[in-house]
């Protein structure tokens, strides 16, 4: 009888204890769990959650210092030291402010959004992307040219926030500490320095619409994007701790700065001043908020972007460094592509300089480098998979400038290069034999 009762006794499916050995046994479909196992699971989940919270780079103890931020940017972005220092300090202060405002204090620190000014292809977007990657925070890129004032055809400014929420997997709390990069911000400048009489829905109107979210407000975001309508549900997001980085080329602002710097005088004794010998990069260093107003940004908008960071146009030396030095440099990427076919790829120093010169001539900066290399490599990348005796390709200056074929190193006729997989097997076999 006792044996029969023992068989019928209920046990925890995880630890094996019977119902008499535990306080409570909870039944599920064909499974049982005791209160002790539930408590243990709860502790494990809590420890993991605390571990993730502690490792957050935004906590005061883990927040990277400006020097550490700059060192990280140096790995991916060539040159622009002044811009990297300014960005590192601004980002450090922003997240330090978030941690400080959590505490009960009389002094509330205000947000300092950032305005990046620099020519096309100088690294504005890459700097913002790299910062977000380092800090492990949600990041979204928006194009200011697609935005219009509410009620007109185009995107509402709230759609920018939706991109950030989506990139945070709809975790609103995490999105509220993210970074938003608004590109082409110079394209929403009003058409003249004076206030417009007619409605400027894609210029001044967008600036007005952006004011609140830049400063910090609780915005209502449609979960599916598009226009708002009264009967839909909204996601509420507070933008007070979102860092906004706006970037633009601001073509022509150098003339405004130059004009401000050269005061002309009238009369026979007047000093005749020639055109400034400074280049665009040097002139941008002298930028003042008043220059942005003359360019067409409204005073309230300029006031919400207090940190002005200028980037210089990239010269030949900087572009060659961009091709070769960063962790994910373009030359390294193409060498890896060829390596997958077991072919060695080399670029001569003259070829790299020729690629950089072409990018400068096209006025595309670093952004145009990939297009130039892709044009050059198209034929050889087409031929290599079929011509199995090629083991090395060297890109020369003539390949870039005159579109001549690369210098190829081939195996004797009839021989075929081994595949990467075969070569690895042969190497492993040789290592075993010599061991």
From Swiss-Prot:
The GO cellular component terms are: HslUV protease complex
One Pfam short name: AAA_2
The positions annotated for binding ATP are 119-126
Q: Where is this region: Disordered?
A: 401-435
Domain ClpX-type ZB as annotated: residue spans: 1-53
Share an example GO biological-process annotation for this protein. proteolysis involved in protein catabolic process
NCBIfam families linked: clpX, PRK05342.1
Q: Which family does it belong to?
A: Belongs to the ClpX chaperone family.
Q: HAMAP family, alphabetically?
A: ClpX
The protein depicted here goes by the name: ATP-dependent Clp protease ATP-binding subunit ClpX
**Source organism per UniProt:** Clostridium perfringens (strain 13 / Type A)
**Lineage, highest ranks first:** Bacteria, Bacillati, Bacillota, Clostridia, Eubacteriales
Gene responsible for this protein: clpX
């Amino acid at each position: 009888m006792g044996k029969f009762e023992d068989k019928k006794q209920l046990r925890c499916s995880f630890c094996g204890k019977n119902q008499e050995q535990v306080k409570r046994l909870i039944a599920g479909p064909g499974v049982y769990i005791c209160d002790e196992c539930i408590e243990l699971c709860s502790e494990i989940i809590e420890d993991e959650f605390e571990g993730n919270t502690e490792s957050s780079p935004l906590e005061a103890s883990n927040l990277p210092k400006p020097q550490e931020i700059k060192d990280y940017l140096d790995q991916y972005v060539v040159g622009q030291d002044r811009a990297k220092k300014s960005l590192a300090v601004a980002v450090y202060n922003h997240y330090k402010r978030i941690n400080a405002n959590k505490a009960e204090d009389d002094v509330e620190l205000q947000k300092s959004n950032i305005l990046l000014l620099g020519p096309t292809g100088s690294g504005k977007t890459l700097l913002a992307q790299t910062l977000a990657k380092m800090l492990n925070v949600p990041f979204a890129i928006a194009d200011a040219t697609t935005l219009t004032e509410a009620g007109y055809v185009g995107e509402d400014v709230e759609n920018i926030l939706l991109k950030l929420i989506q990139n945070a997997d709809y975790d609103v709390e995490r999105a509220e500490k993210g970074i938003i990069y608004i590109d082409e911000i110079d394209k929403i400048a009003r058409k003249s320095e004076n206030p417009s009489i007619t409605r400027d829905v894609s210029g001044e109107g967008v600036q007005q619409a952006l004011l609140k979210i830049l400063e910090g407000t609780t915005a209502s975001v449609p979960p599916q994007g598009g226009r708002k309508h009264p009967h839909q549900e909204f996601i509420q997001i507070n933008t007070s701790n979102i860092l906004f980085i706006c970037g633009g080329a601001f073509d022509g602002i150098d003339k405004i700065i130059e004009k401000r710097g050269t005061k002309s005088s009238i009369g026979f004794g007047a000093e005749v001043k020639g055109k400034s010998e400074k280049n665009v990069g040097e002139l941008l260093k002298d930028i003042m908020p008043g220059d942005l107003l003359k360019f067409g940004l409204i005073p309230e908008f300029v006031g919400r972007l207090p940190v002005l960071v200028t980037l210089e146009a990239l010269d030949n030396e900087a572009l060659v460094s961009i091709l070769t030095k960063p962790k994910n440099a373009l030359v390294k990427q193409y060498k890896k592509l060829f390596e997958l076919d077991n072919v060695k790829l080399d670029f001569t120093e003259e070829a790299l300089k020729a690629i950089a010169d072409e990018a400068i001539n096209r006025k595309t900066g670093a952004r145009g480098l990939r297009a130039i290399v892709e044009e050059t490599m198209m034929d050889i990348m087409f031929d290599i998979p079929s011509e199995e005796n090629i083991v090395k390709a060297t890109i020369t200056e003539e390949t870039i400038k005159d579109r001549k074929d690369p210098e190829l190193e081939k195996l004797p006729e009839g021989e075929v290069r081994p595949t990467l997989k075969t070569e690895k097997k042969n190497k492993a076999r040789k290592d075993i034999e010599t061991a």
